[in-house]
């Protein structure tokens, strides 16, 4: 689960 998606 990605807490902060890559921009």
Swiss-Prot record:
It comes from the Eukaryota. The modification Phenylalanine amide is found at residue 7. Keywords: Amidation, Digestion, Hormone, Neuropeptide, Secreted. GO terms for molecular function: hormone activity. The keyword Secreted applies. It is found in: Secreted. GO terms for cellular component: extracellular region. GO terms for biological process: digestion; neuropeptide signaling pathway. Expressed in the hemolymph, midgut and brain. An integral part of the sensory system that mediates food signaling, providing the neural basis for the regulation of food response; coordinates larval foraging and social behavior changes during development. May have a hormonal role in females. This is Neuropeptide F.
């Amino acid at each position: 689960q990605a807490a902060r998606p890559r921009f």
